[in-house]
Amino acid sequence: TPYSGSLPATISGFHSHDEMNIDLRPLALFAKARVIRAAADDIDLEAKIIHLAGRPPIHFDILSLNVGSRPDASKIAGADEFACPVKPIDQFLARWESVLPQAVQHVSNQENYSIIIVGGGPASVELALAMQYRIHTECKLALESKSSLNISIISSSKEILAHHGAQARQAALDTLQRRSIRVELGHRVKRFLSGSVLTESDGDYVSDATFYATGASLPDWPARCGIGISDDGFIDTLPTLQTASHEFVFAAGDAASIRGASRPKSGVYAVRAGKPLADNLIRFATGKALKPFKPQKHALALISLGDKTAIASHNSFSFKGRLAWAMKQRIDKNFVARFSKLPSMEAELDLEKGLIDAEAEAALRRHAMRCAGCGAKVGGGMLGEVLDDLHEGAESARKPIEDASIIPL
């Protein structure tokens, strides 16, 4: 799964795609969990069943939703056909890989090439500056030189980086202006068209490639499943990270809005919710009292400027330069490494007390494995024990059963 914090450096060409990705398979094995790559078609909260596309349904006792958000410009007419959102990141990178050679070819031939990015937040600023840096670098042009590349940021907001302090806003605006990136504020996009973007003020902006990184919104399916939605359009969540509508459903990250502690949709807040969420999931499973979580009010933001410099912004304080970039690089690389360079797996079974009964725990400990891999590695003794315990006759293929079974011939 891609780590969004490394996206600007990947666009600039400083990181490879592999360096920004976290492989969930070894991580899941390390955590003694399973990864299922399938889209959830529906969640039956009454029966506690998740229906998956192309797979048997999954029963659950506790559900945790960490589904993120999507740019709200996805609701604008023409978004699906003529514009590309920054999320999902894999989809964005596929589009960028097709745009990059086209832009380089046009600019190298001194032909106009226009890129429009809709949205006035950090993501739009980072994308615009990183794209320009990469294209100019590929064309062997100086960063601030005039070229036939035209990049524009269009936002309905009256300010760039509206949720940041005045110093950070001015630093970003100065950088964009110095690098000849056009900034159109107070213009709400009305429609995405083939080759242009139309605003409500009837401004028509020519575009060879259109991207959007607007404010966050929640997909429609949680509400359709019956999960309570807050006034701001996200999953209504209690301080314990339980949803207000269902005590056995938890939510965190961009998808959730914690009552009494609304925060900007930022990866910093999502990451900080990870440990409190894990703790409360275990507490709920073992019948213990849950602990409320109150996220910090302000967080450090590091906004990449595409050229190995960045803006550091915390509340009203801000500074710009290579030090901020070095801080961002260190944080991003350490985050990816933390979930990629894993210690050796322990054979000893480590379970929270009260999670299962003593008999089940004893059985699991007898078969604790260093690898939870392909199943062909299972020893003959263990396989024989399992087969002896199963009744004769194959289980129905419609049931979500994955144990071995004796099939009479």
Regions found by a protein language model. Name each.
Residues A33-I116, F211:
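FAD-binding core/adjacent interface of flavoenzyme oxidoreductases
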Residues W96-S147:
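Rossmann-like NAD(P)H-binding beta-loop-alpha module
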Residues T1-R34, V125-H164:
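Beta1-alpha1 glycine-rich phosphate/pyrophosphate-binding loop at the start
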Residues A255-G306:
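A conserved FAD-binding loop/helix module that cradles the flavin
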Residues A360-L409:
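N-terminal glycine-rich phosphate/pyrophosphate-binding loops that anchor nucleotide-derived ligands
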Residues D307-A362:
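C-terminal auxiliary extensions adjacent to catalytic cores
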Residues V35-D42, Y133-P239:
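A Rossmann-like FAD-binding core segment of flavoenzymes
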Residues E81-E111, S196-L198, D204-R272, D279, ...:
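FAD-site-proximal beta/loop scaffold in flavoenzymes
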